[in-house]
């Protein structure tokens, strides 16, 4: 290819580079409106052309190319324009978008490369220095934004230019040499900053030596030096953040760099100390260095440095609070005997030096911190601040906060005893009257009173009543609570303590100091009632009860109940008070009034009232209890209705409007209490036979239990409630039996049906897998006892009805249970019923005795059943099946060796059975039924043989006579 063609190609490419630079310049001037797609286009163009520009730069340095001056000038102008536009745009925009900054950095490097091509075509020292300067600037931008690839590129090119210039520096003029030194200095500075930010301290120190700022300060003006110091400071801050913030050692590298900055700030640079940023930067450097030293657990050698810098800071910057705080922290880290005293001294210097208002939070925090070590020292500092540093009118906001802090650190003190705390605050409250000229804010008053209230309550709970009184009295001082809306609450608390120490005269004195509204408070009247009762002033106490009853306060009902409870030792007063409770409750008995009662009080009123009735009734004759029963019934009915309403409304969607009283969750134990109370009242009524409406109470118990979501509980809790529902139903049936006097048949029939339903329900529970898996032995026993109780009622009701079919049904059902206890129950009930037809009794006995009886049936019980059967069979001339006798005799023979009869009952039973069998046998023989007669007589001797050989001998003797007279073979019964 000819030189002409080569030059033509170069020319075309350079023209394209110039046009691209010009186009990019236009984009840069529109930087505010650039979208990401625009940036991508710019980025793509640079990525495509930069390698070509790089190639041309190298070629032009090794190959001579002849180009017209106009093109070379155009290249310079395009590159310079692009560079200048970028410089302006990057200063103006300061974009936070990373890609924006990256593209603009690439643009700077592209512009620098074009200037480098120009320098290769038109070589001068000025162009060489300009390119070096541009590469340093690009290197600085890439370092600032942390674009690693661009950092490497610009750093390498800067190094290359540094080498080129060093090779040609002899030909430079003095001005050019000076410029080169400045640029070299700046290049080393950028490297220093880069390696320092990367925590490459060794390389950073190398560049520190190369920079040699102290000797080269003549090349620096105040702005550059301030910027340099700020850069090093910022780098050390970053380095501190990168390192473990909880390190236990002083970072010597950070301290070294900060000391360098301190030294640089003292260099003889013109206008340095008058620079607007000088003072703040120096303070930042010194305070950061002091902070690093103090926080790094300084050793003995470093403590002197800490003292030096803290002293320097406090002297040069007396209005700054941080040096004093650091001095306090350093004191804590030192192993000294009494650090609190030293800290107090530092705090006092701080308060006297700094602007307290602008540093209020820091000063108060330091005082609060000292209070944990020694509250008395902190109080000295805070009182000085309050008296000397705050103006009541101008600084009222801060004055209120400081006063609150005074009460806070004193009441929370761990280094003062209760009496010292009270005395300190009493003295301070006197000082407050001189300090405060304007009323304290509501917030400040509330804060102070809360602290005094809580302290008084804490001491009251600890039974330190005398000291607690001092805190309540402090809260009642006019300077503190004159405008407090709930002053009466504090006065009542004071009355409570006076009552506890039986200082009733002061209780009355506090009452006299109250506002009229607070005097009429139900709680205040309750406290006054206590004092009157203690002084045996019954009339005054009655007046208190009447005032509480008349009060419309939402707490008046509770207060009245508590007041009546206080009267328990005054029977007449107690009865009058109880009547007041009923009167007050009666006024709230209709639904409208009850619905307006506060939701938290509804059930408690009912519960407390019921408890009061029981309590009073226990100490009075039964008649009193009977008189109150209609009221009890009414209250329980109200409780049921209320809880049913709550349950129903809680099942509705949340957006359905409901009365406030029903928008509450009721605890299960609350419902259980009402169920238990209803049950116990029913039992008492049953025992005392004291109420016509007794059947309502077990029904209430059942209704309460039905309101409990037993399905939501685990088995033990579910069984507990189910069991008590069974018990309540049994109690209801027992009461129904007692009342069954008129319309006997109909009532027996109702009892029969209900008891049958109950027996079936219990059986279902017993057979359920849930019960079998989850029940304990005790659960199984208690449920079976419950089953037997229900079955007893069921059997009795069946036997009371003349319907033979029912009795047969009962016999069939009991056989299915296969339980000897059920059989025993069946016989016991039927045998003890005087009105039961004997034929029915015989049928029951025969049915039970025919069953396959297991070992659970005791021999005595078995003989008793047989004896009753034989006795009734003889009276009714009923033929008893012989297999019954065979079965009983067989069981007795099997168990003969283990028979126990310490009281002789079994012997009597067997002797009676033997006698009955003998008589039946004789009757058969008389009727010429000799075969049956022989069998019965033989069984008679068998039973006699079990317990009484004498009886057997006697019977056999009779048999010989009987057999002889009846022509029966005597040997048909073996002796």
UniProtKB/Swiss-Prot annotation:
Gene Ontology biological process terms in this record: homologous chromosome pairing at meiosis; homologous recombination; positive regulation of protein sumoylation; protein sumoylation; reciprocal meiotic recombination; regulation of synaptonemal complex assembly; sporulation resulting in formation of a cellular spore
The keyword Ribonucleoprotein belongs to this UniProt entry's keyword annotation: no
InterPro entries: Spo22/ZIP4, Spo22/ZIP4/TEX11
A GO CC term assigned to this protein in UniProt: synapsis initiation complex
Pfam families: SPO22
Disulfide bonds, paired cysteine numbers: none
Keywords: Meiosis, Sporulation
Keyword Glycoprotein on entry: no
Role summary: Involved in chromosome segregation during sporulation.
PANTHER family reported in the protein's UniProt record: SPORULATION-SPECIFIC PROTEIN 22
Family of this protein: Belongs to the SPO22 family.
UniProt name for this protein: Sporulation-specific protein 22
Species of provenance: Saccharomyces cerevisiae (strain ATCC 204508 / S288c)
Gene giving rise to this polypeptide: SPO22
């Amino acid at each position: 290819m000819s030189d002409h063609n080569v030059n033509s190609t170069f020319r075309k490419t350079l023209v394209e580079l110039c046009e691209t630079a010009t186009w990019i310049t236009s984009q840069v001037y529109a930087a505010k409106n650039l979208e990401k797609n625009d940036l991508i286009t710019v980025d793509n163009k640079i990525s495509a052309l930069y390698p070509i520009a790089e190639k041309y730069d190298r070629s032009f340095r090794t190959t001579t190319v002849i180009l017209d001056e106009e093109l070379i000038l155009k290249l310079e102008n395009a590159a310079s324009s692009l560079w200048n536009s970028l410089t302006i745009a990057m200063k103006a925009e300061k974009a936070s978008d990373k890609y924006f900054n990256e593209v603009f950095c690439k643009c700077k490097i592209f512009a620098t490369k074009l200037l480098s091509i120009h320098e290769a075509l038109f070589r001068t020292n000025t162009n060489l220095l300009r390119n070096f300067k541009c590469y340093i600037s690009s290197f600085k931008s890439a370092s600032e934004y942390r674009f690693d690839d661009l950092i490497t590129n610009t750093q390498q090119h800067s190094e290359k230019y540094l080498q080129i210039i060093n090779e040609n520096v002899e030909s430079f003029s003095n001005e050019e040499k000076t410029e080169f030194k400045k640029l070299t200095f700046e290049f080393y500075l950028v490297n220093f900053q880069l390696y320092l930010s990367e925590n490459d301290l060794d390389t950073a120190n190398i560049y520190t030596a190369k920079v040699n700022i102290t000797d080269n300060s003549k090349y620096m003006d105040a702005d550059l030096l301030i910027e340099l110091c700020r850069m090093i400071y910022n780098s050390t801050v970053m380095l501190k953040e990168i390192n473990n913030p909880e390190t236990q050692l002083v970072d010597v590298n950070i301290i070294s760099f900060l000391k360098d900055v301190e030294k640089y700030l003292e260099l003889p640079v013109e206008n340095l100390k008058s620079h607007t940023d000088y003072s703040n930067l120096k303070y930042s450097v010194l305070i950061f260095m002091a902070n690093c030293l103090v926080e790094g657990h300084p050793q003995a050698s470093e403590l002197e440095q800490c003292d030096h810098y803290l002293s320097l800071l406090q002297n040069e910057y007396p209005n700054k609070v941080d040096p004093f705080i650091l001095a306090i922290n350093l004191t804590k880290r030192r192993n000294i005997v009494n650090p609190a005293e030293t800290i107090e001294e530092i705090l006092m210097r701080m308060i006297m030096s700094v602007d307290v208002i602008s540093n209020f939070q820091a000063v108060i925090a330091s005082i609060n911190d000292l209070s944990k070590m020694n509250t008395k020292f902190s109080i000295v500092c805070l009182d000085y601040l309050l008296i000397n540093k705050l103006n009541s009118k101008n600084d009222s906001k801060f004055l209120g906060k400081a006063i609150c802090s005074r009460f806070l650190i004193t009441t929370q003190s761990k280094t003062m005893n209760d009496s010292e705390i009270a005395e300190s605050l009493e003295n301070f409250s006197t000082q407050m009257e001189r300090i405060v000229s304007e009323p304290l804010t509501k917030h400040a008053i509330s804060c102070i009173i809360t602290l005094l209230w809580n302290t008084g309550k804490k001491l009251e709970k600890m039974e330190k009543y005398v000291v607690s009184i001092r805190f309540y009295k402090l809260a009642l001082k006019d300077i503190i609570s004159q405008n407090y809306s709930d002053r009466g609450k504090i006065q009542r608390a004071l009355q409570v303590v006076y009552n506890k120490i039986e200082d009733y005269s002061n209780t009355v004195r506090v009452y006299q100091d109250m506002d009229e509204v607070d005097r009429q408070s139900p709680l205040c009247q309750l406290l006054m009632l206590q004092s009157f009762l203690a002084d045996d002033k019954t009339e005054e106490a009655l007046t208190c009860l009447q005032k509480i009853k008349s009060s419309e306060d939402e707490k008046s009902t509770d207060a009245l109940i508590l007041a009546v409870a206080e009267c328990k030792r005054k029977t007449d007063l107690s009865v009058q008070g109880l009547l007041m409770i009923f009167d007050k409750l009666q006024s709230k008995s209709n639904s409208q009034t009850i619905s307006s009662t506060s939701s938290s009080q509804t059930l408690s009123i009912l519960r407390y009232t019921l408890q009061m009735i029981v309590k009073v009734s226990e100490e009075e004759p039964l008649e009193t209890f009977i008189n109150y029963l209609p009221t009890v019934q009414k209250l329980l009915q109200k409780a049921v209705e209320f809880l049913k309403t709550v349950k129903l409304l809680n099942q509705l969607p949340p957006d359905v409007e409901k009365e406030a009283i029903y928008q509450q969750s009721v605890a299960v134990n609350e419902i259980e209490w009402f169920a238990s109370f209803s049950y116990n009242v029913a039992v008492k009524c049953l025992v005392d036979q004291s109420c016509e409406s007794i059947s309502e109470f077990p029904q209430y118990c059942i209704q309460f239990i039905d309101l409990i979501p037993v399905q939501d509980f685990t088995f033990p809790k579910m069984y507990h409630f189910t069991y008590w529902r069974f018990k309540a139903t049994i109690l209801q049936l027992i009461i129904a039996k007692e009342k069954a006097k008129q319309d006997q048949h109909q009532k027996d029939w109702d009892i029969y049906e209900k008891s049958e339903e109950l027996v079936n329900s219990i059986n279902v529970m017993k057979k359920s897998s849930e019960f079998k898996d989850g029940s304990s032995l005790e659960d199984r026993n208690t449920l079976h006892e419950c089953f037997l109780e229900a079955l007893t009622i069921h059997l009795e009701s069946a036997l009371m009805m003349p319907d033979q079919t029912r009795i047969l049904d009962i016999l069939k059902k009991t056989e299915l249970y296969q339980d000897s206890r059920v059989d025993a129950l069946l016989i016991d009930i039927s045998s003890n019923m005087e009105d039961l037809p004997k034929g029915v009794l015989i049928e029951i006995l025969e049915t039970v005795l025919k069953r396959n009886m297991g070992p659970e049936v005791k021999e005595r019980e078995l003989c008793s059943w047989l004896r009753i059967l034989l006795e009734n069979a003889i009276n009714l001339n009923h033929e008893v099946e012989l297999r019954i006798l065979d079965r009983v005799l067989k069981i007795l023979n099997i168990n003969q060796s283990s028979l126990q009869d310490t009281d002789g009952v079994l012997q009597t039973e067997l002797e009676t059975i033997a006698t009955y069998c003998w008589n039946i046998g004789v009757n058969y023989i008389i009727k010429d039924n000799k075969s049956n007669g022989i069998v019965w007589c033989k069984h008679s001797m068998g039973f006699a043989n079990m317990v009484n050989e004498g009886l057997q001998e006697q019977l056999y003797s009779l048999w010989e006579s009987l057999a002889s007279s009846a022509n029966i073979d005597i040997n048909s019964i073996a002796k």
